[in-house]
From Swiss-Prot:
Domain of life: Bacteria
Top-level taxonomy: Bacteria, Pseudomonadati, Pseudomonadota, Alphaproteobacteria, Acetobacterales
Segments crossing the lipid bilayer: none
Protein name listed in UniProt: UDP-N-acetylenolpyruvoylglucosamine reductase
Localization in the cell: Cytoplasm
Gene: murB
Active site residues according to the UniProt entry: 173, 222 (proton donor), 292
Cofactor(s) demanded: FAD
GO molecular function: FAD binding; UDP-N-acetylmuramate dehydrogenase activity
Amino acid sequence: MTGSSDFPVKGLRGRLTPNAPLGPRAWFRVGGPADWLFVPEDQDDLALFLREKPATMPVTVLGACSNVIIRDGGIAGTVIRLARGFADITVQGNSLIVGAAALDITVAEHAAAAGLAGLEFLAGIPGSIGGAVRMNAGAYGSDINAVFEWADILTAEGELRRLSHDELGFAYRHSELPEGSVVIRASLRGTPDNADAIRSRIADIRASREASQPVRARTGGSTFRNPDGHKAWQLIDEAGCRGLQIGDAQVSEKHCNFLLNLGQASSADLETLGETVREKVLAQSGVDLHWEIKRIGRKSEGEQTV
C-alpha cells in the first residue's frame, strides 16, 4: 500500500492518497479534494477496507465521474475509486459478466464482438457499469433494467452478496441497492444477432449523440430527469434558459439539459445555475425539475446552501 501511515485501516494493498485532488478526474473538471482516495487492488482488498474502517468514517464511491458535481469543499472521509482490477469483461453464453469499472461503451463494443444485441444503448451513456446499475442508466430506448440479470456487491460491512433483478427494484433512474454497498460486477443479458448489424447500430447511436449533445465539452451528461409527460430540455428551452450563464457555467446551447464548464467555473457556479434553471422552469411551466446529476461533497466555506 502507498499512502499515509495515519490511515486507520492497516494491511491494504491498493493505492491510498491523502488530500487527493478530485477535480481533474471529473468530467466537469471541478471539485475539491477527497480527505482520502482509496483505489483498491482487488475485491479482497476492498472487502478488508469495508470490514475494518471506522463506523464513523464517511465513504463515497466514484466511478467515471461523468454524472456528478463534486462540490468545491471536497469530500469528507474516504472516496473509493475502482480501477483496472474491477474492469474485466467475459462472455458466458448470452450474458456478459462485467466488472463495475468497465466503461459503458466498452461493454457495448464487447457485446457487439460477441454477437449479442440489446446492449447497444450503453454506447450512448458516459460512465461505468457500477454507476449504470446504481442509477438504472438508460438511453436510446433502453436501460439497465431491460438487460440486468444479477449483481455482486460488497455490503457496507464488506460482505459479498449476489442480488437478483427483483431485489434491485429498478425504477426510472433508480435502484434499491443497499445503503453503503459497492457494486463489484454485474451480469447483463444479450440476444444473439449479427455482429456487423450490432456495430452499425452502435455507430448510429454514437453519431446521434455527437450531433445532438456537447460531448466534447466539460459537461456531466443529462442534468435533470425527464418529468412524466415532458422532456426536460424542452421545458428548459421554453423557460428561456438556453445559453443561460453564471460565471463560466453555462446551459448548453446545443442541448439545454446539459450544463457546461466553459473554463473557470466552480462547482458552486454549476449548482447555482442548475437551481436557477429549476426556478425558471417552475415559474414558466409549473413543473419541478429533479436533478439527475449527483451533487456530492462539502460546500466551500461561506457558500450558501442550495
